[in-house]
């Protein structure tokens, strides 16, 4: 399903009305390899590996100058209201692959760069990197979905989600909520 520009525009008020704190986790995903997805009931998050078994450690899209994976992209969080708009389990396009999906306001105003988030027993730090809805997002969910993410005034809303580094190892479960602990 590729949403129309009109559907995306009409959904914006609903997306922006998401909880500003204590957002429930609605989906967990691990990517063992490109275009592979598994949906466990919990994820282990570590500073050293991101999510053990996830492709971030071996095949990240961004690396440090020394070749190591950039820790600022260890974990991505996507708003569940956006996911519901662009993807359904019956779609032929794969799930976007964000490890955590939650009903939470991910905007820059709500979660400025550097904000610490308690996610289960783990702590994540919101990255300054903008998740712009890469080529895969456009191919899977349509050019309208990509254009919507980067439209004037939209980048600060972080409609494609946020990128985070693991600050403290821990575990996140489907029953957890995401809470702001600083920022």
Residue ranges and their predicted role:
Residues 1-183:
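Metal-cofactor-dependent catalytic cores
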């Amino acid at each position: 399903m590729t949403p129309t520009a009109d559907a995306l525009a009409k959904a914006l008020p609903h997306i922006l009305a998401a909880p500003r704190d204590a957002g429930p986790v609605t989906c967990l995903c691990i990517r063992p390899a490109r275009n592979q997805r598994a949906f466990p009931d919990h994820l282990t998050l570590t500073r050293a590996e991101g999510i053990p078994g996830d492709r971030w450690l071996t095949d990240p899209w961004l690396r440090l100058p020394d070749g190591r994976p950039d820790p600022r992209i260890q974990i991505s969080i996507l708003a569940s209201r956006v996911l519901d708009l662009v993807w359904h389990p019956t779609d032929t396009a794969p799930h976007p692959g964000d490890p955590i999906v939650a009903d939470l306001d991910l905007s820059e105003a709500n979660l400025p760069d550097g904000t610490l988030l308690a996610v289960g027993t783990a702590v994540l730090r919101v990255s300054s990197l903008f998740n712009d809805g890469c080529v895969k997002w456009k191919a899977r969910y349509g050019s309208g979905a990509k254009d919507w993410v980067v439209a004037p005034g939209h980048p600060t809303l972080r409609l494609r989600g946020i990128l985070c580094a693991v600050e403290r190892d821990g575990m996140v479960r489907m029953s957890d909520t995401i809470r702001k602990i600083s920022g």
